[in-house]
């Protein structure tokens, strides 16, 4: 499941505010995505994160 993947900032130096599902807390948490090399646990909105990961 993408919701159990770790937060992955990526190797690029962009600045994209995103959300990931933190499986330890059971919550969608904000983080800054670098723009490339991430994984599926990377959502543009809090609503999208909550809808997919049922947070």
Swiss-Prot record:
InterPro entries cross-referenced by the UniProt entry: Kunitz_BPTI, Kunitz_BPTI_sf, Prtase_inh_Kunz-CS, TFPI/VKTCI-like
Lipoprotein among keywords: no
Keywords, sorted A to Z: Aspartic protease inhibitor, Disulfide bond, Nematocyst, Protease inhibitor, Secreted, Serine protease inhibitor
Record protein name field: PI-stichotoxin-She2a
One MF term in the entry's GO annotations: serine-type endopeptidase inhibitor activity
Residues carrying the site annotation Reactive bond for trypsin: 13-14
GO cellular component: extracellular space; nematocyst
Role, per record: Active against serine, cysteine, and aspartic proteases. Can bind vertebrate trypsin and chymotrypsin.
Disulphide bridges, residue numbers: 3-53, 12-36, 28-49
Similarity field: Belongs to the venom Kunitz-type family. Sea anemone type 2 potassium channel toxin subfamily.
Keyword Secreted: yes
Gene3D superfamilies attached to this UniProt entry: Pancreatic trypsin inhibitor Kunitz domain
Entry-linked CDD domains: Kunitz_SHPI (cd22618)
Domain BPTI/Kunitz inhibitor: 3-53
Subcellular location as annotated: Secreted; Nematocyst
């Amino acid at each position: 499941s993408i919701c159990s993947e770790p937060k992955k900032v990526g190797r690029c130096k962009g600045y994209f505010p995103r959300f990931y599902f933190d499986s330890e807390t059971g919550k969608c948490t904000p983080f800054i995505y670098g723009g490339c090399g991430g994984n599926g646990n990377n959502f543009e909105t809090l609503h999208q994160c909550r809808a997919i990961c049922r947070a």
